[in-house]
Curated annotation (Swiss-Prot):
Lineage: Bacteria, Bacillati, Actinomycetota, Actinomycetes, Streptosporangiales
InterPro entries: RecX_HTH_1st, RecX_HTH_2nd, RecX_HTH_3rd, Regulatory_RecX, WH-like_DNA-bd_sf
Gene that specifies this protein: recX
Protein name: Regulatory protein RecX
Family: Belongs to the RecX family.
Main function: Modulates RecA activity.
Amino acid sequence: MPDRAADGRDGPPGGSAAPEDLYARARAICLRLLTRAPRTRAQLTDALRRREIPDEVIEAVLDRFGEVGIVDDAVFAEAWVDSRHAGRGLARRALAAELRQRGVDEDTVRAAVDGLSPAQEEATARQLVRRRLAATRGKPTEVRVRRLMGMLARRGYSAGLAYRLVREELEAEGVEVDFPSPEEG
């Protein structure tokens, strides 16, 4: 059975151990968290503070992890954008909000979401609309439009893009659409 104190799950609170023990404990906590899922520097900092690790130990551990490339918010942000855009169809706005929520700084967020082109974003939104249209055939047009607009809004797409794509895809199905675009009021 592994020693729980050695891996940072139990043991004395942060302030009562020797600095070397605190460093080893913080390192073990970070490594355990990182084996489950990638984390940002801010997420690791929060986790260590909850375990009463002193700030100077946190900085030392995370600086070292940054030097060797174990913790890199820019790499995390790029991977997050690629994964969440491909998997969930999230738009740049929603992706940026998720990254900010995870403690990624604004410049890194901007760089990561700028890697997603407007053409990619539109193509993904169009795929989402087509998939949802197929699932809502037979329902009244108003219901379909409302569901499509809500889905795109929840994923962070602008109202202008959403209206345009919904209109184009419904017209491609031969459905007469008569709803104002956001620009028309």
